[in-house]
Regions:
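Catalytic or ion-translocation cores adjacent to nucleophile or general acid/base/metal-coordination motifs
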Residues: 150-195, 230, 268-283, 287-291
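Hydrophobic alpha-helical segments, chiefly the membrane-spanning helices
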Residues: 347-352
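Short, glycine-/Ser/Thr-/acidic-enriched flexible segments
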Residues: 1, 99, 126-128, 148-150, ...
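Conserved catalytic micro-motifs used in adenylation/nucleotidyl-transfer and phosphoryl/amide-
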Residues: 120, 132-149, 153, 239-278
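Short, compositionally biased
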Residues: 159-172, 316-335
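Extended, highly charged
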Residues: 1-118, 122-124, 128, 174-241
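Phosphate/diphosphate-binding loops
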Residues: 232-236, 246-247, 283-317
Length: 353
């Protein structure tokens, strides 16, 4: 079965004009696994794909996304537990059904001195509404989630219902990747599915998350009119994915954290003199000396904090709003917005940097 699945992936890559560079058996240490994890221990391999010359990183990742989704639809019937952790030029995902403090022991790669990164996203909580599975271990491809999406059934139903009207110049073959969200995964995995589709269609991860998990804007008389127009424009096309939810997310450009509008999950941050920032739900995650800290705080309901990894810039909630409101003339867009889904969702999504 493994050989068949690998062949399916290779064919999907070739369809997107991508060249396979090779496969690697990922070193693992099963001795740290519990009984259930050992009984379901998967075969773990890493794929390497050459980037074609003269295409952008964004286009490369979009092709990888399409290849992955087509492959997943093909091999699902062969093995429903087969799973592609990530297929991206920006990030790599190490996940497992093991205790958090032994993840680096399970994956010796993480102990290798040559392993280096400017940003890392991790998750140490355990599922409360789904049975543990290797493929459902967090983080997912873009996000990790603390809490629940209590509107998940409605969000899934609307995503599937609207998918026939989704269209984007960036994803001309979007019908090939139906269903666009998982119906049998966790609530967090479904949110991750929706986030990656919106990014592949041309939205930034920050803008996409503000559409999916907006603040309470309707009755906020202090909110900038242009920002309110942004949220009103997208409210006609996407219902809020309501928590309580604390979300951390990362792609090659941004690392960010946001709370849903209820604000019932903690998200605390610390910034140090040597330009390190740590955002976590628990204070005990970081142990910086007091004299090394220049700022600390917590996110409020509906707020977001992000780091532009390319520019090395911290974006607070106001800067994020300034960025997304300048992406399009949303007040004017509202004049042409209809609540009808038949107008095409992704095609009417102005994308901001």
């Amino acid at each position: 079965i493994a050989r068949k699945i690998k062949r399916i992936i290779e064919v999907a890559l070739k369809r997107e004009g991508l060249e396979l560079a090779g496969w690697r058996d990922v070193p693992i240490n099963p001795s740290v696994c519990g009984e259930m994890a050992l009984n379901t221990l998967p075969q773990i391999e890493q794929i390497f794909v050459n980037c074609p010359q003269e295409i952008s990183a964004e286009n490369f990742n979009r092709r990888l996304f399409l290849a992955r989704r087509r492959a997943e639809n093909k091999f699902e019937d062969l093995d429903p537990y087969a799973y592609i952790n990530s297929l991206s030029s920006d990030s790599i995902s190490y996940k497992g059904m093991v205790m958090p403090d032994v993840l680096a022991e399970f994956y010796p790669d993480l102990l290798d001195e040559r392993m280096a990164t400017s940003a890392c996203l991790f998750h140490q909580r355990f599922s409360t509404n789904t049975l543990p599975e290797w493929r459902l271990a967090q983080p997912f491809r873009y996000l990790a989630h603390n809490g629940e999406i209590n509107t998940i059934q409605g969000n899934r139903n609307w995503a599937i219902a609207r998918s026939k009207y989704f269209c984007s110049d960036s994803l001309p073959d979007i019908k090939d990747i139906d269903p666009i969200v998982s119906l049998n995964g966790s609530d967090s995995s479904t949110l991750d599915n929706m986030l990656e589709v919106m990014q592949a269609a041309g939205m930034s991860i920050i803008q996409a998350m503000r559409v999916l998990i907006p603040p309470a804007w309707q009755a906020n008389e202090m909110m900038d009119a242009d920002i309110k127009a942004f949220y009103e424009f997208y409210s006609c096309q996407m219902e809020p994915w309501d928590g309580p939810a604390g979300i951390v997310m990362m792609n090659g450009r941004y690392a960010a954290c946001c709370l849903d509008r209820n604000g019932l999950r903690p998200a605390r941050y610390v910034i140090t003199k040597d330009r390190h920032i740590t955002i976590a739900s628990e204070i005990g995650v970081y142990d910086y000396p007091a004299d090394a800290v220049i700022k600390k705080g917590r996110l409020g309901p509906g707020e977001m904090l992000a780091i532009d990894l390319l520019k090395g810039e911290l974006l607070d909630n106001q800067k994020i709003h300034d960025q997304i409101k300048d992406g399009a003339p949303y007040k004017s867009c509202l004049l042409y917005t209809s609540p009808s889904p038949r107008d095409g969702l992704l095609s009417r999504m102005p994308s901001s940097a």
